[in-house]
From Swiss-Prot:
Origin organism lineage: Eukaryota, Viridiplantae, Streptophyta, Embryophyta, Tracheophyta
Residues annotated with Phosphoserine modification: 240
Any one GO molecular-function label of the UniProt entry: RNA binding
GO biological process: cellular response to water deprivation; chloroplast organization; circadian rhythm; monosaccharide metabolic process; plastid translation; polysaccharide catabolic process; positive regulation of DNA-templated transcription; positive regulation of translation
One Pfam family this sequence matches: Epimerase
Protein name per Swiss-Prot or TrEMBL: Chloroplast stem-loop binding protein of 41 kDa b, chloroplastic
Swiss-Prot/TrEMBL induction comment: Expressed with a circadian rhythm showing a peak during the end of the day (under long day conditions). Repressed during senescence and upon water stress. Accumulates at wounding sites. Altered expression of both oscillator and output genes.
Tissue specificity: Highly expressed in seedlings, particularly in photosynthetically active organs. Mostly expressed in young and mature leaves, and, to a lower extent, in flowers. Low expression in etiolated seedlings compared to green seedlings.
Outcome of gene disruption: Small and pale plants, with altered chloroplast morphology (anarchic membrane organization) and reduced photosynthetic performance associated with a reduction in CSP41A levels. Altered monosaccharide pattern of heteroglycans. Lethal when associated with CSP41A disruption. Reduced transcript levels of photosynthesis genes. Defects in embryo development. The csp41b-2 prin2-2 double mutant is embryo lethal.
Keyword Aminoacyl-tRNA synthetase carried by entry: no
Complex and partners: Component of a complex made of CSP41A, CSP41B, ribosomes, and the plastid-encoded RNA polymerase. Interacts with CSP41A. Binds DNA when in complex with PRIN2.
Gene that this polypeptide is encoded by: CSP41B
CDD domains in UniProt: SDR_a1 (cd05265)
Location, primary (coarse class): plastid
Length: 378
């Protein structure tokens, strides 16, 4: 099959105290993480190298994280190319984005069309372009990264989107960057990629988000709650509902990705990125209701072991405590999230679900199974 390299320029077509826990009812548990060296930097400071614009490649960039990251990078004056299969438009207006901002972005963003699993094409096309920096947003396996490194021997920095899902389940939380990882995790490919980057001696940085939310989220995180709130239905929550989790806004994640660009302190380092506060499952249901202007919801607790849901997922979060410290990113990078949880959920609701847009249709099949059994754990 003939391979084509397309580099196109598109024209316009048309946002709990530090490491704290909150159950949304005001109770807070402080879990401080100490660092020997504290670096004080002004809020919002960026550490981009003195040399002006960078020629940046984003692997992916048309689904969620890359949509916001690419705009920040373009506004900072960098030449940005998205490497995608071309199944989604490279330039589409974001909710809340002004016509002028969209026009500016569309006139500057570039596109390299191809399949990253076609390694020969990746090597030939990237070698011809000679990028300074790679942001790998959609990489899952180490074998997908090696051809990129081979094609770009003079690469200045490889910035990788990993996952906090790589950590080994533990009774001691929050997860910190030096914690044990799980080689059997479903994210083991990301662990192997981090190991590959380290072994190749390149200048790399890895970002480990927890749960990401925000407008255009393709994972049913906040959307799952919004569907039920809009329908006036009870919210089924597994077990006690006091399981502690953590969400980070996509715009704060994009800012963290920018903060590591050209930053010597980020060289060969891993950073957890998410919100500063932790939240219980019950608290998250209440926060989503507040964000969308809904009444406080009825929460129904159930025992998942009493049901056979088949392949359907009855709840969008892992049924366990799962949260990570972002202290390293705050102290080393000078990064700080802009959004608290309710503010971020409000931003997501107003710019997405509240406008009648969502990624997946509501499916209350598992809810009905739970509610019909009326099994409530006190």
């Amino acid at each position: 099959m003939a391979k084509m390299m397309m580099l196109q320029q598109h024209q316009p077509s048309f946002s709990l105290l530090t490491s704290s826990l909150s159950d949304f009812n005001g109770a807070k548990l402080h879990l401080q993480v100490q660092y020997k060296r504290k670096v004080h930097q002004p809020k919002g400071a960026l550490y981009v190298s003195a040399s002006s614009e960078k020629k940046i490649l984003i692997m992916g960039g048309t689904r969620f994280i890359g949509l916001f990251l690419s705009r920040i990078l373009v506004k900072e004056g960098h030449q940005v190319t998205l490497f995608t299969r071309g199944k989604s438009p490279i330039a589409k207006q974001l909710p809340g984005e002004s016509d002028q901002d969209f026009a500016d972005f569309s006139s500057k963003i570039l596109h390299l069309k191809g399949d990253r699993k076609d390694y020969d094409f990746v090597k030939s096309s990237l070698s011809a372009e000679g990028f300074d920096v790679v942001y790998d947003i959609n990489g899952r396996e180490a074998e997908e990264v090696e051809p990129i490194l081979e094609a770009l021997p003079k690469l200045e920095q490889y910035i990788y989107c990993s996952s906090a899902g790589v950590y080994l389940k533990s009774d001691i939380l929050p997860h910190c960057e030096e914690d044990a990882v799980d080689p059997k995790s479903r994210h083991k490919g990301k662990l192997e990629t981090e190991s590959l980057l380290q072994s190749k001696g390149v200048n790399w940085t890895s970002i480990r988000p927890v749960y990401i939310y925000g407008p255009l989220n393709y994972n049913p995180v906040e959307e799952w709650f919004f569907h039920r709130l809009k329908a006036g239905r009870p919210i089924p929550v597994p077990n006690s509902g006091i399981q502690i989790s953590q969400l980070g806004h996509v715009k704060d994640l994009a800012t963290a990705f920018l903060n590591v660009l050209g930053n010597e302190k980020a060289s060969r380092e891993i950073f957890n990125i998410s919100g500063e506060k932790y939240v219980t499952f019950d608290g998250l249901a209440k926060a989503c209701a507040k964000a969308g202007g809904f009444p406080e919801p009825e929460i129904v607790h159930y025992n998942p072991k009493e049901f056979d849901f088949g392949k359907k997922k009855a709840f969008p979060f892992r049924d366990q405590h799962f949260f990570a410290s972002v202290e390293k990113a705050k102290h080393v990078l000078g990064w700080k999230p802009e959004f608290d949880l309710v503010e971020g959920l409000t931003d997501s609701y107003n710019l997405d679900f509240g406008r009648g847009t969502f990624r997946k249709e509501a499916d209350f099949t598992t809810d009905d199974m739970i509610l019909s059994k009326k099994l409530v754990l006190q």
